[in-house]
UniProtKB/Swiss-Prot annotation:
The record marks D77 as: Transition state stabilizer. It is an enzyme of class 4 (lyase). GO terms for cellular component: cytosol. Pathway: Porphyrin-containing compound metabolism; protoporphyrin-IX biosynthesis; coproporphyrinogen-III from 5-aminolevulinate: step 4/4. Belongs to the uroporphyrinogen decarboxylase family. Its main location: cytoplasm. Pfam families: URO-D. This is Uroporphyrinogen decarboxylase. One of its GO terms (molecular function) is uroporphyrinogen decarboxylase activity. Catalyzes the decarboxylation of four acetate groups of uroporphyrinogen-III to yield coproporphyrinogen-III. Its EC number is 4.1.1.37. Homodimer. It catalyses: uroporphyrinogen III + 4 H(+) = coproporphyrinogen III + 4 CO2.
């Protein structure tokens, strides 16, 4: 196994001491970077980019070449799994993802099956290629994160046929035919576990489950239709590979009211959106998990001084509840395509500098 030059991200997920707070950004390889847009133009389409391991490797490394980030995340899409199930994924310009064959009837659901992981080999090849490309002077620069959508979030797209403002189609099925929804979610959970395990086998050193639409569910429905199936995913995961622990991060956007229950399904870390107070979240989870987050992504449209002030606020909030260890800095959701790249430099600089000062006792956490 190649040694890591920088393992702060993995140590933070294990709640071990780090010299500073590590960070990475959701969608860090994306449309806000001109170099990403140039590569995407060469690929011809988003799917042409995501399904080509060489292109996926190139764009995964682009933010690391621009910023001193502490982790890389596989460039892919959460909808690769339902695409492999035969739902016919496409991306229309300006419209987002669409499925040609959404799950609308009992017959549709009856035909659904866990896909052959060989049909997703392009993802696993990308993981392997990225791991190799991260090696510099005989050591790997930073760890690589693999990921998947949660069973519920995948089901939202699979039933709606694309994105939605109100999820009325998938929710109507959930309320009217819970048996069909449970079948979809059970298949999705099995598929997600297998998909993440294959990423781990290919070289992912941590994995994240994106429950982007869990927060759209009512209390009670969340536990039954999202959390229960993320628990099943985690129960099926390899938590160790090649002699190394594989940390697992779970992120439910809008899930702040359920932190204790999310911690109860056994992740190593919980991702938080910007509506959650970090100090309170830390007290509520009683140090059982690391926390990841959680600055509002739109802060990156503000002035340099405002960005630095907001970064310090996030770091101070976490540190005020018992020191800085066990925190991975991130945005509360994905970075906007309109973000000025130079503002990301300011954020990264302030995270590293202020968190070092907190640990050295040069500044006190403002409460």
């Amino acid at each position: 196994m190649t040694a890591l030059q920088n393992d702060t991200f993995l140590r933070a997920l294990r709640r071990q001491p780090t010299e500073y707070t590590p960070l990475w950004l959701m969608r860090q390889a994306g449309r806000y970077l001109p170099e990403y847009n140039a590569t995407r133009a060469r690929a011809g389409s988003f799917l042409g980019l995501a399904k080509n391991p060489a292109y996926a490797t190139e764009v995964t490394l682009q933010p690391l070449d621009r910023y001193p980030l502490d982790a890389a995340i596989l460039f892919s899409d959460i909808l690769t799994v339902p695409d492999a199930m035969g739902l016919g994924l496409s991306f229309a310009q300006g419209e987002g993802p669409r499925f040609a064959h959404p799950l609308r009837t009992e017959a549709d659901v009856a035909k659904l099956a866990v896909p052959d992981m060989a049909s997703l080999q392009y993802v696993f090849d990308a993981v392997s290629e990225i791991r190799k490309a991260l090696v510099q002077d005989g050591r790997q620069r930073v760890p690589l994160i693999g990921f998947s959508g949660s069973p519920w979030t995948l089901a939202c797209y699979m039933v709606e046929g694309g994105g939605s403002d109100d999820f009325r189609t998938v929710k109507a099925m959930m309320y009217a035919r819970p048996d069909l929804m449970h079948r979809i979610l059970d298949i999705n959970a099995t598929a997600v576990s297998a998909y993440l395990n294959a990423q781990i086998e290919a070289g992912a050193q941590a994995v994240m489950v994106f429950d982007t639409w869990g927060g759209a569910l009512a209390d009670g429905m969340y536990q039954a239709f999202s959390l229960a199936y993320m628990r099943k995913v985690l129960q099926g995961l390899k938590r160790e590979h090649d002699g190394q622990q594989i940390p697992v991060i779970v992120f439910t956007k809008g899930g702040g009211i359920w932190l204790e229950e999310i911690a109860g399904i056994g992740p190593d870390a919980i991702g938080l959106d910007w509506t959650v107070n970090l100090a309170k979240a830390r007290r509520r989870t009683e140090g059982r998990v690391a926390l990841q987050g959680n600055i509002d992504p739109t802060v990156l449209f503000a002035s340099e001084s405002a960005i630095r002030e907001q970064v310090r606020g996030v770091l101070d909030s976490y540190a005020s509840a018992g020191g800085s260890d066990g925190h991975v800095f991130n945005l509360g959701h994905g970075i906007s395509q309109f973000t000025p790249p130079e503002n990301v430099s300011v954020l990264v600089d302030e995270v590293h500098n202020h968190s070092r000062k907190l640990r050295a006792g040069q500044v006190a956490a403002a409460v």
